[in-house]
Amino acid sequence: MVIFKTVNDVRSQVKEWKKQGLKVGLVPTMGYLHEGHESLIRKASKENDKVVVSIFVNPTQFGKNEDLGSYPRDLERDIEVCTRGRATAIFNPEVEEMYCDNASTFVNITGLTEGLCGASRPIHFRGVCTVVSKLFNIIPADRAYFGEKDAQQLAVIKRMVRDLNIDIDVVGCPIIREEDGLAKSSRNTYLSLEERSSATILNKSLTLAKEALNNGERDSLKIIEIISKNINTCNLAKIDYVEVVDSLSLQRVNYIEKSVLVAIAVFIGKTRLIDNFTFELQ
């Protein structure tokens, strides 16, 4: 496992692999890797000759009162996960390597970023798109892998790649869950034992919504009500949003006639967790 710290070094290596006709996969992460990340790395290693995992806590996607300073970091643990997943290399730059002094160029996408997480985190996706576009430029991979837990992020990145004619395939990968249904997340480490137990309310509430949809319910407000009512039975839970949106446009729908994304964001104590599922009409 080789660890690159500079743009020039990782770019040179990837270009050399490409000259040899090798396929390269990229797994962009902020580190503190878990089984969800490992599943992305494993998929990338099966579909490519070489895999680069980027580990970079990107400051431009955090708001003023968010958890940039406390975001968990453990490079040794990350190296172990990358090794198990059969990654070839890690790109672990410092902030100064990724952003020069007085950097003034950012990538901003309208429409898709305005609802869901974008409503309460207004600068988040500008930071995400900027750093991901930089990574795509630094590491000219054939494919990039992202988890479907961050469904809005996945949709936004796919749109950015389409709109900017970036030559890379964006691959979405299924949500990986704990045994009790909680979606794997680096932020789960913030939860106390009581909060961790309460956090299962997210998946339980989505499961109730899924059952209602499978039984024929098509009114989005009814689905939102089912989820919200169940979440509100948990004293430690505070809803940020519960939405039913078109899977492609991420616009709210009133009546479900095609594929929709059912997405939620909930504070358990001070920790903000997200989860979702996609419902496909048969």
UniProtKB/Swiss-Prot annotation:
Residue sites binding beta-alanine per the record: 61
Additional detail: The reaction proceeds by a bi uni uni bi ping pong mechanism.
UniProt pathway annotation: Cofactor biosynthesis; (R)-pantothenate biosynthesis; (R)-pantothenate from (R)-pantoate and beta-alanine: step 1/1
Biological processes per GO annotation: pantothenate biosynthetic process
Organism the protein comes from: Enterococcus faecalis (strain ATCC 700802 / V583)
NCBIfam families: cyt_tran_rel, panC
Main localization of the protein described in the UniProt heading: cytoplasm
Alphabetical keyword list: ATP-binding, Cytoplasm, Ligase, Nucleotide-binding, Pantothenate biosynthesis
Residues binding (R)-pantoate, per UniProt: 61, 153
CDD domains: PanC
Record-listed E.C. numbers: 6.3.2.1
Name by which UniProt lists this protein: Pantothenate synthetase
Intracellular or extracellular location(s): Cytoplasm
Function of the molecule: Catalyzes the condensation of pantoate with beta-alanine in an ATP-dependent reaction via a pantoyl-adenylate intermediate.
Oligomeric and partner information: Homodimer.
Record's catalysed reaction(s): (R)-pantoate + beta-alanine + ATP = (R)-pantothenate + AMP + diphosphate + H(+)
Keyword Ligase in record: yes
Active site positions: 37 (proton donor)
Positions bound to ATP: 30-37, 147-150, 176, 184-187
InterPro entries recorded: Cyt_trans-like (IPR004821), Pantoate_ligase (IPR003721), Pantoate_ligase_C (IPR042176), Rossmann-like_a/b/a_fold (IPR014729)
Domain of life: Bacteria
Protein family according to the UniProt entry: Belongs to the pantothenate synthetase family.
A GO CC annotation given for this chain: cytosol
One Gene Ontology molecular-function label: ATP binding
